[in-house]
Structure formats: structure tokens, C-alpha cells
């Protein structure tokens, strides 16, 4: 294994980087590349990096050097993405000290530098990133969260731009996902008080989703879709999901009656946001497509009609129908939306499409969305029981397949009883933890 091959395998997260390194009698030439990887990776799971460290005889020294360099980068605000690795290397205390110092600095600067817009903007971004670091990477206690809430409320109340307020709303959303949406309410109920408490309550009210209206009429729902407010659109999509068949059909009829492209697209968002609700009139939808729509996919004609047209095609993509198959073929033979054309084969594949599908596995398409879509489609069709697909042949391309698709391929091979033994050990050390789990279950 050459150094460049080793670096390529590490970058792709392939288990062969670990296996082949273990077989090297002299690992010294690979140490610098390994250290470089340990100081530039940014993954949400670090078993792969810990396996890499364990390959070296001086594993403890390598771990200390990786920790030292990552801490230095973190102090310089260049390495926040490696906190999980630093945790695994036992640097919890150092991380908390750096974060506490940084948090206090940014908090003070935000309160004193508002007269300098660029300085304020820089400190605002630093503050927000630090809060996310505390909440996301430091496994915070409830006391740490309590300490942050007053500053967030202050920041929200003093924000003059919508983006500034959206930053705080984003953090509240994160708190919701991490701790449950009742956290701020619970803190208030237990008597925890702070300045700007009313502001924080208003923030929570703004974030809180509008309850679904079970009695909403089709007319009101159609009217409300004409809004650029994200909360309003979310309400419409959730209400549409709970609506009866009559409302679904009424929205579809409103779409056909509408002449404005933007309004048509807004109505289609109700279906796109509810994948379980099929568009009730697919044939009429296909009839609705015009050559003007097709022209909109070709530069320099890309415009609002392009987005609308893509939404229509996305609704048709899962429908098994000769006309949809023809649309998919036209897309694959064109210059735009070819990935969607490949995706349409999931519901409309015939043996005659095999050559077209396989053509996207050509080396000229490696590392492109077209290659990825072709691999995904082959796995999907194989899982449906379709025979004659080059599923096993994909093994030869294994190192060129992204980690999330490697997982799909491994799963499909296992389902078909075609998973090769010589790939088992490599997958056992893949960066993707889900691939490791699949192999563990196979054993």
C-alpha cells in the first residue's frame, strides 16, 4: 500500500485502510498521514479513528500528539469539529475550559460591540457557534443550559436583524431535539428567573408549532399556502396530512385552475411535504406538462418555472406508468434533471433500461450524483426482487462508492445472499457505524 493509497482510503473511510496498515511491517511512513487525518476529520462517530490509532506501536504517543494538535486548533477556533475525538482521547477538562473562556469573551463582546457592525457580526457568529458547541458536544448538564438561557434571551431581545433572531430560534429548536420541547417551560416552572423572561416566552411562542385544525376548509388551506412564512407553511402541510380525501381533491383542482406558476408550485408543496398522499390525478398532471416547461430545464432558461417543473416531475417519479417511463427516458437523455430520470426507473424499470442504467457506472461518472443515483437505483430494484441487475458487479467499485451508499449496497448484498466473505473484514472496520452493525448481525 502506497502513502497516497492509504490517504485515499482514509478519506473515503474504507476499512481496508485499517486492515492493510496492520499488515505493513514498518508503519512509520504512514504515521504522518494518519496524524494528518486525525487532525482534519470531522465525523460524528470516532471508532474508525480509534482503530487507526491502535494500529501503531506508539499508539499512546500518537493519541497524545493528535490531542495536542486538535486542542491547539480548537483554541484557535479552527477545530471545533473534532471535539468528539478529543472526548474519546480524554480531553474533557481542557475542552470545557476553552469553551467557558470563549463563551464569556463572546458574550461580553456581543454586549459591547454593537456599534461596530462587522465586529458585532463576527462575535455573534462566534457566540452562536460556541453555544452549539456547548449544547452539542459537551454533554451539558441542566445547570449549563440554565446559564445559557438568559444570554440567549438577551441576544434575542436586542437583535435588529431577522437572521440574528433566527439563530436563537435555531438553538431553541436544537434544545427541543436534544432535551425535549418542555425544557424552557420546566425551567420557568421551577422558579428559575432571569432578565428578559418575557422575551424568552415570546420566542417559545413563536417557535411552538400551530396546532393542526381538524375543521380547516379546503378554501382556507389553499389561501394559507400563499405564504412565505415557514411556520405557516408547516401548519398547512400538517393540516393537509390530516385532511380528508375531499380536501386533497380540492387542492388538486385548485392547482389545475391556477395559471400563475408560483401559486401552482405553492400548492404542490402540500403534496411534496406529504409523500404518503399521492397526487389524485396523475394523468391530468402529465397532460399539464408543456414544451414551455421542458424548455425551462435548459440554461439559460432556468427560472421559477424550472422549480415548478421539477416539483411536478418529483410527484410523478414514484408512479408506475408508461408515460412516466417516457418522461424518465427523456430526462436521462437530456442535460438537466438526469438524476431524477434515473430515479424514475425505481417504479418504471424494464430490462430494456439496463444498458442506460449501467452506463452511469462508467468511470467518467465516478464521484458524481449520476453515479450515486445509479448505484442507489440498482440496490432499490434488487431489493424489490428484480433480476438481471449488476449488483455483484458493484463490489468492484466499492472504494468509489460513498459511505452512505456502501451501506445500501452491503444491505442489498446481504438480503440476496450475495455478500462476499472477502469483503466482510473490510466492512467490519468501515467508518460508517451502520455498516459495522450490519456485519456484526451477519456474524
List each language-model region with its residue ranges:
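Residue-level detector of extended alpha-helical repeat arrays and alpha-solenoid scaffolds
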Residues: 31, 128, 165, 230-234, ...
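Hydrophobic core/packing positions within alpha-helical solenoid repeats
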Residues: 38, 50-53, 83-86, 131, ...
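Hydrophobic core positions within HEAT/HEAT-like alpha-solenoid repeats
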Residues: 18-21, 35, 132, 149, ...
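Eukaryotic acidic, Ser/Thr-rich intrinsically disordered low-complexity regions
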Residues: 2-14, 196, 200-204, 419-443
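Amphipathic alpha-helical scaffolding segments comprising HEAT/armadillo-like alpha-solenoid repeats
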Residues: 3-4, 28-37, 59-70, 94-114, ...
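Charged, amphipathic alpha-helical stretches
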Residues: 1-73
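Short inter-helical turns and helix N-cap capping residues of alpha-solenoid HEAT/ARM repeat scaffolds
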Residues: 161, 228-229, 259-260, 293, ...
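Extended alpha-helical scaffolding segments
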Residues: 125-150, 154-169, 374-443
Amino acid at each position: 500500500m502506497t502513502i497516497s493509497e492509504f490517504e485515499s482510503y482514509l478519506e473515503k473511510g474504507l476499512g481496508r485502510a485499517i486492515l492493510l496498515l496492520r499488515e505493513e511491517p514498518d508503519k512509520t511512513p504512514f504515521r504522518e498521514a494518519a496524524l494528518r487525518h486525525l487532525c482534519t476529520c470531522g465525523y460524528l462517530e470516532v471508532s474508525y479513528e480509534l482503530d487507526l490509532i491502535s494500529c501503531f506501536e506508539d499508539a499512546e504517543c500518537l493519541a497524545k500528539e493528535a490531542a495536542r494538535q486538535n486542542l491547539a486548533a480548537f483554541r484557535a477556533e479552527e477545530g471545533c469539529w473534532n471535539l468528539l475525538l478529543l472526548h474519546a482521547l480524554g480531553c474533557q477538562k481542557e475542552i470545557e475550559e476553552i469553551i467557558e473562556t470563549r463563551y464569556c469573551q463572546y458574550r461580553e463582546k456581543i454586549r459591547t460591540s454593537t456599534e461596530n457592525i462587522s465586529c458585532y457580526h463576527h462575535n455573534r457568529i462566534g457566540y452562536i457557534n460556541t453555544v452549539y458547541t456547548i449544547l452539542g458536544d459537551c454533554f451539558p448538564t441542566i445547570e449549563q443550559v440554565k446559564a445559557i438561557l438568559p444570554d440567549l434571551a438577551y441576544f434575542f431581545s436586542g437583535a435588529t436583524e431577522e437572521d440574528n433572531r433566527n439563530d436563537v430560534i435555531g438553538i431553541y429548536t436544537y434544545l427541543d431535539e436534544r432535551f425535549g420541547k418542555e425544557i424552557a417551560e420546566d425551567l420557568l416552572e421551577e422558579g428559575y428567573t432571569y432578565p428578559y423572561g418575557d422575551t424568552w416566552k415570546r420566542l417559545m411562542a413563536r417557535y411552538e408549532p400551530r396546532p393542526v385544525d381538524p375543521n380547516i376548509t379546503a378554501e382556507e388551506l389553499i389561501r394559507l399556502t400563499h405564504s412565505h412564512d415557514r411556520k405557516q407553511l408547516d401548519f398547512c402541510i400538517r393540516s393537509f396530512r390530516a385532511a380528508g380525501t375531499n380536501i386533497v381533491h380540492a387542492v388538486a383542482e385548485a392547482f389545475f385552475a391556477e395559471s400563475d406558476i408560483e401559486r401552482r408550485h405553492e400548492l404542490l408543496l402540500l403534496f411534496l411535504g406529504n409523500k404518503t398522499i399521492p397526487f389524485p390525478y396523475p394523468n391530468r398532471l402529465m397532460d399539464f406538462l408543456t414544451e414551455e416547461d421542458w424548455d425551462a430545464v435548459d440554461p439559460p432558461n432556468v427560472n421559477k418555472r424550472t422549480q415548478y417543473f421539477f416539483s411536478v416531475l418529483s410527484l410523478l417519479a414514484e408512479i408506475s406508468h408508461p408515460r412516466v417511463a417516457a418522461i424518465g427516458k427523456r430526462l436521462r437523455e437530456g442535460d438537466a434533471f438526469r438524476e431524477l430520470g434515473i430515479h424514475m426507473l425505481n417504479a418504471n424499470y424494464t430490462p430494456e433500461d439496463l444498458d442506460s442504467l449501467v452506463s452511469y457506472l462508467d468511470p467518467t461518472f465516478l464521484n458524481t450524483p449520476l453515479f450515486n443515483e445509479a448505484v442507489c437505483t440498482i440496490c432499490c430494484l434488487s431489493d424489490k426482487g428484480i433480476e438481471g441487475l449488476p449488483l455483484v458487479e458493484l463490489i468492484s467499485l466499492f472504494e468509489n462508492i460513498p459511505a452512505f451508499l456502501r451501506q445500501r449496497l452491503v444491505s442489498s448484498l446481504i438480503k440476496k445472499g450475495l455478500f462476499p466473505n472477502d469483503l466482510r473484514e473490510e466492512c467490519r472496520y468501515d467508518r460508517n457505524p451502520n455498516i459495522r452493525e450490519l456485519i456484526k448481525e451477519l456474524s
